[in-house]
């Protein structure tokens, strides 16, 4: 009975939040539809945190509400007054746009890669190898995950392809070796910690190198066009290096303290892993085929970006896995995590886009410029960086966030006399990768990691908030002073 009451409370909370926001007068200068849309968006976030029903269902319902209520949530009076404007047709087109997102399908491809590792047995083999040599202590496994991701980052300009398509499929095979399973109390034995370490690794590696994540390059384009400032690959790396090294050392250990796994040492498991490797014998045809596809995909992701899109590489890999009988189609149709994540990310991308479509982002930029009048240059830098960073709670993609918010923040900073624009620009672009730890939907790998079921929603949000604050604090308190000395 108590469980039912608790679930009813969780179900009502988002509706109450939305209702209260609807009753609050629209802020000065904000389009009415933007405020009403923002109310639905906030209610969706509350629902995804409390999870009275699955998070994917929450985001799906939110998109449906916005499509049906588009006259009050998306479109302004001028659009609606145009006889040639078909509101319902445009709303439905908007609502389904997320399913054509390249990021969404790249994430889906990464999930199928993970399935390939599982079905072929290659993932289990690599996992056993890691456990044999580094599995005596859980903490060393955590550091191994971070190091592997960072070593791949300079050559893989997509964190979803790198962490989601290369690292995750391997690490996903480790927890079951320790009797730790998803969506089960045993997830905390070791699975939850290892999955969170991938969140740590992808956020650090994405900020360490310009080529660590696609939105980094997009950010540099905006910096060049709007601020007229050029940032080189080496300059980026050296600016983040002091912060990155410190976080690389402390983040796995701090995760171990804050989200401590039940299994910390296991000499027996390391010995057992060696025996299991002997039992598995030589690599099978399926495993060799998958290795070839992995190397092909990595090669195209690293060297073929000018010829073939990263998402197309992922779809090519899936097609070849099907054609070469690495993964049967029936297994893909039964792979609930992949389809669930596809719908979840597609709907979140749409909802984030709606903030711009409704006029909320434009109002936000204008209001922020007004409120920053009279601030000192350094205070302005801090405020702009923090606003840009924590605004990522509103976005389901680093690329979408960068494309939407970075031009706004740069324009605001450029318009205020005395602001050190080079320092501001570098701090803004360096923060793009590390903000990927904030929420389960913050970046492609995060969606994949959360979708596998080892880290509960409340734990993800709690850890994301803690590490999000630590990351940005280190960037401002350590990275900025060093950057100021160099300049």
Curated annotation (Swiss-Prot):
InterPro entries: CitT-rel, SLC13A/DASS. The chain crosses the membrane at residues 11-31, 60-80, 95-115, 138-158, 190-210, 214-234, 237-257, 288-308, 309-329, 345-365, 379-399, 401-421, 424-444, 463-483. GO terms for molecular function: antiporter activity. Belongs to the SLC13A/DASS transporter (TC 2.A.47) family. DIT1 subfamily. It is a multi-pass membrane protein. GO terms for cellular component: plasma membrane. It comes from the Bacteria. The keyword Cell inner membrane applies. Its main location: membrane. It comes from Escherichia coli (strain K12). This is Citrate/succinate antiporter. Responsible for the uptake of citrate in exchange with the efflux of succinate, fumarate or tartrate. Has a relatively broad specificity for C(4)-dicarboxylates and tricarboxylates. The keyword Plastid does not apply. Signal peptide: none annotated. Disulfide bonds: none annotated. It is found in: Cell inner membrane. Keywords: Antiport, Cell inner membrane, Cell membrane, Membrane, Transmembrane, Transmembrane helix, Transport.
């Amino acid at each position: 009975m108590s469980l039912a009451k608790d679930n009813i409370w969780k179900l009502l909370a988002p509706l109450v939040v939305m209702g209260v926001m609807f009753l609050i007068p629209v802020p000065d200068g904000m389009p009415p539809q933007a405020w009403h849309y923002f109310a639905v968006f906030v209610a969706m976030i509350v629902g995804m945190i409390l999870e009275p029903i699955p998070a994917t269902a929450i985001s799906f319902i939110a998109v449906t509400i916005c499509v049906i209520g588009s006259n009050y949530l998306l479109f302004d009076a001028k659009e609606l007054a145009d006889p040639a404007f078909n509101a319902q047709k445009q709303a439905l087109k908007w609502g389904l746009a997320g399913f054509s997102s390249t990021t969404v399908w790249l994430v889906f491809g990464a999930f199928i890669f993970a399935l390939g590792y599982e079905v072929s047995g290659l993932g289990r083999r690599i996992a056993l190898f890691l456990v044999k040599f580094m599995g005596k202590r859980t903490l060393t496994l955590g550091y191994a995950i971070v190091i592997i991701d960072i070593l791949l980052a300079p050559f893989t300009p997509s964190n979803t392809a790198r962490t989601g398509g290369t690292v995750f499929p391997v690490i996903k095979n480790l927890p079951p070796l320790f009797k730790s399973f998803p969506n089960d109390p045993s997830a905390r034995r070791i699975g939850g910690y290892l999955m969170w370490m991938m969140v740590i690794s992808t956020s650090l590696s994405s900020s360490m190198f310009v080529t660590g994540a696609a939105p980094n390059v997009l950010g540099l384009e905006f910096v060049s066009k709007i601020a007229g400032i050029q940032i080189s690959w080496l300059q980026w790396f050296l600016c983040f290096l002091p912060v990155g090294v410190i976080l690389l050392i402390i983040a796995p250990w701090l995760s171990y303290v804050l989200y401590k796994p039940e299994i910390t040492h296991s000499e027996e498991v390391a010995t057992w892993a060696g025996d299991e490797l002997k039992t598995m014998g030589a690599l099978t045809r399926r495993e060799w085929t998958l290795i070839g596809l992995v190397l092909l995909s990595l090669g195209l992701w690293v060297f073929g970006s000018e010829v073939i899109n990263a998402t197309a590489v992922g779809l090519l890999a899936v097609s070849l896995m099907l054609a070469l009988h690495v993964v049967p189609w029936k297994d893909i149709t039964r792979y609930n995590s992949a389809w669930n994540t596809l719908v979840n990310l597609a709907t979140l991308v749409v909802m984030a886009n709606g903030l711009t479509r409704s006029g909320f982002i434009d109002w936000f930029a204008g209001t922020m410029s007004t409120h920053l009048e009279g601030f000192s240059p350094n205070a302005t830098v801090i405020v702009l960086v923090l606003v840009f960073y924590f605004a990522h709670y509103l976005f389901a993609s680093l690329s979408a966030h960068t494309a939407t918010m970075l031009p706004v923040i740069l324009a605001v900073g450029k318009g205020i006399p005395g602001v050190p624009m080079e320092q501001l620009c570098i701090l803004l672009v360096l923060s793009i990768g590390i903000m990927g730890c904030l929420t389960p939907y913050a970046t492609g790998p995060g969606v994949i990691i959360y979708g596998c079921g080892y880290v509960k929603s409340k734990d993800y949000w709690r850890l994301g908030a803690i590490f999000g604050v630590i990351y940005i604090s280190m960037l401002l308190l350590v990275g900025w002073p060093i950057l100021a000395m160099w300049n």
